[in-house]
């Protein structure tokens, strides 16, 4: 068999020329597509760059023509402005008892449960660190005191004989202490235990209620007005605690017929709990003056209550007319008696003056002797009360026996009383 073969100048077969041209055309198309893609990408980048430059350009053709105007225009076109308009709206703090302080009204959150104290115990801590409430007189005192007072009144504790004087059992007191530390006042508690814990709360304060007053100031306080001016020197917390305690003692005195506790007795048992001194003898002497101060304040409170009760009574016209008639008849009788006695007064005037002088001297001597005997009795009573408290504190710490350093033998009880008695006898003999 024979066939025809065509040869070209470029070499190769003539039948493959058409396929070569197709291949070169496809490559050209691919290159054009790549070039177009690159151009489109470059155009996109240029467009984005142009927009960013236009948004941040500075217009130097403004009226002011300054640099400040250009900067303000650039800042105006920026999406995020400079923090130039800043205001301090509120300052919020957190307190354990009151929650968040300083929050707006719509964001305030009430804490449902409040602990009675910031510490583990409600005894031996300052009143500032405890949750406080207001009593009927407006005194801000720890809530635990108000709870104990309410329970004492509800159980008729003020009518118990020897209230605040009879010491409770230590085992029962420790159990009630644990309950009070959790803000719970047990039911059916012994009123003497409750009264003893009220005294213990004042006694175990970091600083006494009356420690802000010097012993010299308390010693020089003799009248009711001086006592009122003296307690004004106390801080608000101590002043509120003292007013609350005085009102409590006044309530006790009002039930004197049942509890056998007068103003002097209740002041005597509270006095050693109001001050704290390192020297026991100095504390004992200072307690006597504190007792007199408390007694004066109690008497003043009772007098004010009596005046308020008397002033609240209604006005009765019939009673006033009867009293006026009685007073007129009494005045007439007095006039008759005075007229009859004018003749005899001139004769025995000198004798009566002599008798009055003698009676006055005798009364002064008896009064001074009675005051000295009263001072001795109050001093002895406070000594016993003070020593009993020291013994109770030592027994609570050791739980076994009373320490020898705090025993009654460490204090010259007999010698001090004997010196006072000798002074009394010498003054009487003179």
UniProtKB/Swiss-Prot annotation:
Biased composition (Basic and acidic residues): 357-371
Domain of life, source organism: Eukaryota
Region annotated Disordered, chain positions: 1-36, 307-372
GO biological process, alphabetically ordered: signal transduction
Molecular function via GO: GTPase activator activity
Domain Rho-GAP: 125-310
CDD domains: CRIB, RhoGAP
Feature type site, description Arginine finger: 165
Cited Gene3D superfamilies: CRIB domain, Rho GTPase activation protein
InterPro entries cross-referenced by the UniProt entry: CRIB_dom, CRIB_dom_sf, Rho_GTPase_activation_prot, RhoGAP_dom, RopGAP1-5
Bias kind Low complexity: ranges: 316-326
Quaternary structure and partners: Homodimerizes via its Rho-GAP domain and forms a tetrameric complex (2:2) with ARAC1/ROP3, ARAC2/ROP7, ARAC4/ROP2, ARAC5/ROP4, ARAC7/ROP9 or ARAC11/ROP1.
Function: Acts as a GTPase activator for the Rac-type GTPase by converting it to an inactive GDP-bound state.
The protein's name: Rho GTPase-activating protein 2
Organism: Arabidopsis thaliana
Underlying gene: ROPGAP2
């Amino acid at each position: 068999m024979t066939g025809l073969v065509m040869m070209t100048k470029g070499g190769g077969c003539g039948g493959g020329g058409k396929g070569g041209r197709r291949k070169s055309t496809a490559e050209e198309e691919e290159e054009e597509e790549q070039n177009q893609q690159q151009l489109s990408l470059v155009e996109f980048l240029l467009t984005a760059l142009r927009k960013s430059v236009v948004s941040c350009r500075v217009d130097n053709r403004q009226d002011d023509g300054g640099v400040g105007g250009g900067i303000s225009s650039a800042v105006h076109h920026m999406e995020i402005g400079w923090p130039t308009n800043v205001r301090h709206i509120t300052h919020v703090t957190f307190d354990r008892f009151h929650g968040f302080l300083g929050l707006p009204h719509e964001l305030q959150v009430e804490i449902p449960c409040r602990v009675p104290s910031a510490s583990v115990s409600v005894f031996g801590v300052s009143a500032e660190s405890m949750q406080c409430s207001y009593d009927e007189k407006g005194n801000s005192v720890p809530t635990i005191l108000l709870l104990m007072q309410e329970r004492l009144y509800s159980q008729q504790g003020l009518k118990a004989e020897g209230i605040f004087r009879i010491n409770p059992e230590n085992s029962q007191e420790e159990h009630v202490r644990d309950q009070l530390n959790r803000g719970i006042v047990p039911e059916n508690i012994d009123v003497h235990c409750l009264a003893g814990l009220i005294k213990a709360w004042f006694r175990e304060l970091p600083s006494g209620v009356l420690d802000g007053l010097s012993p010299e100031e308390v010693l020089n306080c003799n009248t009711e007005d001086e006592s009122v001016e003296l307690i004004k020197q106390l801080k608000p917390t101590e002043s509120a605690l003292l007013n609350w305690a005085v009102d409590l003692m006044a309530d006790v005195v009002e039930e004197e017929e049942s509890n056998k506790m007068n103003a002097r007795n209740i002041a005597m048992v509270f006095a050693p709990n109001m001050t704290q001194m390192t020297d026991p003898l100095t504390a004992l002497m200072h307690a006597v003056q504190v007792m007199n101060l408390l007694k004066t304040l109690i008497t003043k409170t009772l007098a004010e209550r009596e005046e308020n009760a008397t002033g609240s009574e209604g006005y009765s016209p019939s009673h006033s007319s009867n009293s006026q008639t009685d007073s007129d008849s009494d005045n007439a009788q007095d006039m008759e008696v005075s007229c009859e006695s004018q003749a005899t007064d001139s004769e025995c005037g000198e004798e009566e003056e002599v008798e009055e002088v003698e009676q006055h001297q005798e009364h002064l001597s008896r009064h001074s002797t009675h005051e000295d005997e009263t001072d001795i009795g109050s001093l002895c009573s406070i000594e016993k009360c003070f020593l009993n408290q020291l013994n109770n504190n030592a027994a609570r710490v050791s739980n076994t026996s009373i320490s020898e350093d705090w025993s009654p033998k460490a204090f010259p009880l007999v010698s001090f009383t004997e010196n006072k008695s000798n002074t009394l006898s010498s003054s009487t003999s003179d």
